[in-house]
């Protein structure tokens, strides 16, 4: 049985879906005002790998990941560029799809956009106001955190702890609030900003309400898994829980999952340190499958360190797996040995999607394959395991001239004409084709 580390309970829990053999997942997507950075990619790859393992186990996965296309950062960037917020969002949504495509990330079941859910957002906020859990102040609408049951339980904080931390705030927005911790559900329009009409005047939604509405509209009041980066645990996911459970009276998500941060050369990635890396730029020099392999093979909850050496190692390891995959098939192998690898792989991945252990099994299996155990059953199993990590190798076909040279070399060896055989081997090596003579015949790999 799959076990998931649930942030809410700080414990490993058996995964039991609401509907048998179906997984409903909502993962917070990017705010589309710029190209995604390596931290965004880490989250996208981590949850794509989790999705793929569920599918490997036979589940049907409804995978929802949103685009935040109404936000302060988008408004600022659009104004600076002299274009509309929609034009800016469209540009970076297209860039996101291109970049994640190169990372082998499967398209989501749906990618909802905030601009398409404005009526539903207004209705959601209205319900909270009517219930007395939200209030209007100068055109803004705020959520009353003091009325929320066990607010900040996800972050393992008490309301009293948070109030002490917020006690010194004196900005203009705080003056409009009943409590400094109250958060905006709806923001009154400002000059030069995109806005929509509402019962409280023209404005736009706050960030937290957007995800609550899109998740519940598509997947229902209670979902199986809600995920995102560790930085979203508080306040974003905390506020999603407060407003969603207040409105519906139901548990918002049964499992909360958060991926770890990405460091660059052992330092936290930030623009101020000058180590902020976009995926768009990185893909100019690093193959998308290599970057994917680096990100996917680290245990998703742990921080990872991005270095040139780590990328180089990922490239070398991926090449080994590719060469293994391209080996010619052998006679039928011991199926009990194959089953041992499959069982060990499942045991690793069932343990909170431990890809670090899972990839170790993959390399152990590759070593076994290279020792002459590679019939069609093994190849099919190997490919399915690779696909969990988002790795798909195309079948490589040698051109006729190279195939002819390999045949000529085999004939020369059969006739004990080793000088000709060695010459052909060197000629093929110059073209990047490495030959391996085994008891099953000649195998080749491409450097």
Locate the predicted segments by residue.
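N-terminal, positively charged nucleic-acid-binding surface of large information/translation enzymes
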Residues: 9-12, 18-104, 440, 444
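Short phosphate-binding/catalytic loops that engage adenosine nucleotides
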Residues: 59, 133, 433
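Short, glycine/charge-rich beta-strand/loop segments that flank catalytic centers
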Residues: 67-71, 93-96, 106-121, 139-148
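Short, polar/flexible loop-turn hinges at active-site or ligand-entry regions and domain interfaces
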Residues: 81-87, 108, 301-305
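Structural preference for alpha-helix termini/caps and helix-kink/transition segments
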Residues: 268-447
């Amino acid at each position: 049985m799959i076990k998931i580390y649930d942030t809410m309970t700080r414990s490993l829990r058996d995964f039991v879906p609401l509907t048998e053999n179906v997984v409903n997942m909502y993962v917070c997507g990017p705010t589309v005002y710029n190209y995604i950075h390596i931290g965004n990619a880490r989250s996208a790859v981590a949850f794509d790998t989790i999705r793929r393992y569920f599918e490997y186990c036979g589940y049907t996965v409804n995978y929802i990941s949103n685009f935040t296309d109404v936000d302060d950062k988008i408004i600022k960037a659009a104004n600076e560029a002299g274009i509309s917020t929609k034009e800016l969002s469209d540009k970076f949504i297209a860039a996101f799809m291109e970049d994640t495509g190169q990372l082998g990330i499967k398209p989501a079941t749906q990618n909802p956009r905030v601009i398409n859910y404005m009526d539903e957002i207004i209705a959601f906020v209205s319900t909270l106001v009517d219930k007395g859990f939200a209030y209007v102040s100068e055109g803004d609408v705020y959520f009353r955190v003091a009325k929320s049951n066990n607010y900040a339980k996800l972050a393992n904080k008490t309301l009293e702890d948070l109030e002490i931390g917020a006690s010194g705030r004196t900005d203009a927005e705080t003056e409009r609030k009943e409590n400094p911790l109250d958060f905006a559900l709806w923001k009154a329009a400002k000059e030069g900003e995109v806005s929509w009409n509402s019962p409280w005047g023209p404005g736009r939604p706050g960030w937290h309400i957007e995800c609550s509405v899109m998740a519940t509209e598509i997947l229902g009041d209670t979902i199986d898994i809600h995920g995102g980066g560790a930085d979203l645990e508080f306040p974003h996911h905390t506020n999603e829980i407060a407003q969603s459970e207040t409105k519906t009276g139901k548990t918002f998500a049964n499992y909360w999952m958060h991926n770890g941060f990405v460091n660059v050369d052992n330092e936290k990635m930030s623009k101020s340190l000058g180590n902020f890396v976009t995926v768009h730029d990185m893909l100019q020099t690093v193959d998308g499958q290599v970057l994917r392999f680096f990100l996917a093979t680290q245990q998703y909850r742990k921080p990872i360190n991005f270095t040139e050496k780590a990328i180089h190692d990922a490239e070398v390891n991926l090449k080994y797996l590719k060469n293994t995959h391209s080996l010619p098939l052998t006679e039928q192998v011991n199926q009990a040995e194959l089953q041992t690898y499959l069982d060990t792989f499942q045991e690793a991945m069932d343990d909170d999607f431990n890809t670090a252990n899972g990839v170790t099994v993959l390399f152990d299996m590759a070593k076994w394959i290279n020792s002459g155990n590679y019939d069609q059953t093994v190849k099919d199993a190997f490919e399915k395991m690779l696909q969990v990590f988002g790795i798909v190798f195309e079948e490589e076909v040698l051109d006729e001239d190279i195939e002819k040279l390999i045949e000529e070399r085999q004939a020369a060896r059969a006739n004990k004409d080793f000088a000709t055989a060695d010459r052909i081997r060197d000629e093929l090596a110059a073209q990047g084709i490495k030959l391996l003579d085994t008891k099953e015949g000649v195998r080749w790999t491409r450097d």
